[in-house]
C-alpha cells in the first residue's frame, strides 16, 4: 500500500516537473533520470494502461451483451467515448490516432451498403451494393466509373467511345485454328463458373471479368451478319422493351404521389422512360455496329462484346437509379398514407365524440319534454275535474232557480221600451207649451203613480238586498266578482235616486199634467233598469 502511494506521488512529482519545464514526459524522464528509470517507469505505466483497458473491455463486453439480451441497439465504439466532450479535439483524431495501422488498412478497404446497412470489402461487392448510395441528387457518372475501377473493371469499356478497329482480311486457312481457340475459351469459362465469387455484402454471385482470347497473328474471315437476322433481333428487343414499359411501376408512384401533392423527381432523365429509351438506343447501337462491320475477325467480335458489356453496364446503372427512385417514392407514399390514416382516425374519433355528445343532449331534451308532457297531462286532468265540478254546481243552481229564458225575454222587452222612451222624449221636446197646459188635469193621477213607484222602488231594493244576501253565501272564489258587481249596482242605484230627486223637482216646477206624464215614464224606465240589474246577479248565483 505504501509502495503504491509512493509511486503515485512520484508520478505526480515527475508530471509537474515535466509541465513546468515545458517538455514532454518521456523526454523529461530520459534526460533527467536516465534509461533504467525510464524503462521501469514506462513498464509500470504500460501495465496500468493494460489494466485500465482490460477493465474498459470487460465493461464494453458486458454492455454489448446486455444490449443483445434485451434487444437494444448495440453501442457504437466511437460514440460511447466521452473524451471528445471532456477534451475538445479534432474529429480526425479518432480516425487517425485512436486506430492502429492494421485496422486502418482494414477499414479503408471496406465500403458501406445503404441497402443492407453493412460494411463489406469493396473488392468483393456487387455493383448493386456498391452503387446503393446513388440517388437523384447524386448521379455523377465519374463516381460510378471510379467505383467500377476499384472493382478491377476495365475502365476503357466505360470511358472510350465506340470505335471500329481496322480489320484485315486473311486467308481461309486460319479459320479452323480460331474456331479451336473459341472452343477452348468457352471450356475455360465453363470451368471458371465453379470458381465464381460471391458478394461480401448480399452473397450474390459476382460477374467476373472475362478473360481475353489468346491473340493470334492469324486472323480469320467471318460471314457478315444477315440484315434480316439483325432486324428480327431488333424487333424482339423492342417487344421486350414494350413489355418492360407495360410492367413498369405506374407514373403516380414514380413521379410523385399526385393525391398528396409531393414531387419526387425534378429531372426527366432519371425517369424510367428515359432509362428504357437509353436501352433502346443501346440496342440500336448494337445493331448498327453489327451491320457496320463488314469484315469481322476474332478481335472485332471481342470488341463488339466489350461494347455490348459497356452498354449493358450503362443500362444497369440506369436501372439501379430507377430502382432507387421507385424505392424512395414508395417510402414517401407509404409515409404519407400512414399520416393520412392517422389523421382520418383522429377525425373519426372527434366525429364519434361529437355524435355521442349530441346524442346525450337529445336524450336529456327528450327526458325534459317527457316530464313537461306529464305535467301538462296532470294539469289537464285537474281542469277536467274542475269542469265536472262546475257542471255539477251549474245543474244544482239550474234545478234551484230554473232556466234563464224569462230573463232573456225581459231583456228584450227592456230594450224595446228604451227605444219607445227615447222616441217619446223626442216628441216631448217638440211639443209646444200649450200642449203642456192641456195635460195638467192629470197631475193628481201622476202623483198617485209616483207613490206607487216609490213603493215598487222599496220592493225592488228589498229584492236587491235578498240577492246580496244570496250572493254572500257563495264560495271564496266568486266573492271578488260579486263585490265588484255589487259596487256597480249601488252606483247605478245612487245615480237613479239622484235622477228621481231631479225628476221630482222638475215635476214641481212644471205643470201638473206634464210632470205626471214625465214621472210616469221615468218610473217605468227605472223599473226596467232595476229588473235588468237584478238579472246579472241571478245569473252569477247560478
UniProtKB/Swiss-Prot annotation:
Pfam families reported in the protein's UniProt record: Zein-binding
Keyword Membrane applies: yes
Recorded topology in the membrane: Single-pass membrane protein
Compositional bias segments (type: Basic and acidic residues): 471-480
Cellular localization per UniProt: Membrane
A GO cellular component annotation in the UniProt record: membrane
Keywords: Membrane, Signal, Transmembrane, Transmembrane helix
Listed transmembrane segments: 39-59
Signal peptide: 1-21
Domain of life: Eukaryota
GTD-binding domain mapped to chain residues: 300-398
Biased composition (Polar residues): 437-456
Cited InterPro entries: GTD-bd, MYOB
GO MF assignments: myosin XI tail binding
Region annotation (Disordered) ranges: 219-239, 419-480
Role, per record: Probable membrane-anchored myosin receptors.
PANTHER family: MYOSIN-BINDING PROTEIN 2, MYOSIN-BINDING PROTEIN 6-RELATED
Name of this chain's protein: Probable myosin-binding protein 6
Species of the source: Arabidopsis thaliana (Mouse-ear cress)
Amino acid at each position: 500500500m505504501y509502495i503504491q502511494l509512493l509511486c503515485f506521488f512520484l508520478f505526480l512529482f515527475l508530471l509537474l516537473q515535466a509541465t513546468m519545464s515545458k517538455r514532454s514526459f518521456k523526454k523529461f524522464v530520459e534526460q533527467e533520470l536516465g534509461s533504467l528509470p525510464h524503462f521501469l517507469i514506462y513498464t509500470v505505466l504500460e501495465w496500468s494502461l493494460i489494466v485500465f483497458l482490460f477493465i474498459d473491455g470487460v465493461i464494453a463486453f458486458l454492455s454489448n451483451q446486455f444490449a443483445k439480451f434485451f434487444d437494444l441497439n448495440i453501442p457504437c465504439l466511437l460514440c460511447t467515448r466521452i473524451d471528445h466532450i471532456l477534451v475538445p479535439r479534432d474529429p480526425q483524431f479518432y480516425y487517425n490516432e485512436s486506430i492502429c495501422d492494421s485496422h486502418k488498412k482494414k477499414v479503408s478497404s471496406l465500403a458501406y451498403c445503404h441497402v443492407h446497412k453493412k460494411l463489406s470489402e469493396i473488392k468483393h461487392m456487387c455493383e448493386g451494393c456498391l452503387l446503393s448510395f446513388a440517388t437523384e441528387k447524386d448521379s455523377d457518372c465519374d463516381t460510378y466509373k471510379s467505383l467500377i475501377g476499384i472493382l478491377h473493371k476495365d475502365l476503357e469499356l466505360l470511358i472510350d467511345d465506340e470505335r471500329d478497329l481496322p480489320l484485315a482480311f486473311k486467308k481461309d486457312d486460319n479459320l479452323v485454328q480460331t474456331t479451336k481457340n473459341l472452343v477452348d475459351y468457352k471450356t475455360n469459362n465453363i470451368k471458371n463458373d465453379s470458381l465464381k465469387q460471391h458478394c461480401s455484402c448480399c452473397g450474390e454471385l459476382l460477374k467476373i471479368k472475362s478473360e481475353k482470347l489468346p491473340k493470334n497473328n492469324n486472323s480469320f474471315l467471318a460471314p457478315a451478319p444477315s440484315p434480316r437476322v439483325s432486324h428480327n433481333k431488333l424487333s424482339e428487343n423492342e417487344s421486350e422493351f414494350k413489355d418492360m414499359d407495360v410492367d413498369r411501376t405506374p407514373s403516380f408512384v414514380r413521379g410523385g404521389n399526385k393525391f398528396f401533392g409531393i414531387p419526387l423527381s425534378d429531372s426527366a432523365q432519371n425517369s424510367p422512360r428515359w432509362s428504357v429509351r437509353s436501352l433502346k438506343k443501346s440496342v440500336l447501337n448494337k445493331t448498327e455496329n453489327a451491320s457496320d462491320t463488314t469484315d469481322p475477325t476474332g478481335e472485332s467480335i471481342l470488341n463488339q462484346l466489350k461494347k455490348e458489356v459497356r452498354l449493358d453496364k450503362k443500362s444497369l446503372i440506369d436501372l439501379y437509379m430507377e430502382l432507387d427512385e421507385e424505392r424512395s417514392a414508395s417510402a414517401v407514399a407509404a409515409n404519407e398514407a400512414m399520416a393520412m390514416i392517422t389523421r382520418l382516425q383522429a377525425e373519426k374519433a372527434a366525429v364519434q365524440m361529437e355524435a355521442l355528445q349530441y346524442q346525450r343532449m337529445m336524450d336529456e331534451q327528450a327526458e325534459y319534454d317527457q316530464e313537461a308532457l306529464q305535467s301538462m297531462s296532470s294539469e289537464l286532468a285537474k281542469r277536467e275535474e274542475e269542469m265536472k265540478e262546475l257542471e255539477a254546481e251549474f245543474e244544482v243552481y239550474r234545478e234551484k232557480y230554473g232556466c234563464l229564458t224569462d230573463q232573456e225575454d225581459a231583456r228584450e222587452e227592456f230594450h224595446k221600451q228604451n227605444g219607445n222612451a227615447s222616441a217619446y222624449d223626442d216628441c216631448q221636446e217638440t211639443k209646444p207649451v200649450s200642449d203642456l197646459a192641456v195635460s195638467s188635469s192629470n197631475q193628481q193621477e201622476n202623483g198617485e203613480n209616483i207613490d206607487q213607484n216609490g213603493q215598487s222602488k222599496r220592493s225592488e231594493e228589498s229584492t236587491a238586498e235578498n240577492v246580496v244576501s244570496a250572493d254572500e253565501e257563495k264560495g271564496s272564489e266568486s266573492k271578488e266578482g260579486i263585490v265588484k258587481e255589487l259596487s256597480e249596482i249601488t252606483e247605478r242605484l245612487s245615480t237613479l235616486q239622484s235622477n228621481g230627486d231631479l225628476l221630482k223637482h222638475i215635476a214641481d216646477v212644471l205643470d201638473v199634467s206634464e210632470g205626471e206624464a214625465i214621472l210616469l215614464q221615468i218610473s217605468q224606465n227605472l223599473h226596467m233598469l232595476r229588473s235588468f240589474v237584478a238579472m246579472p246577479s241571478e245569473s252569477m248565483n247560478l
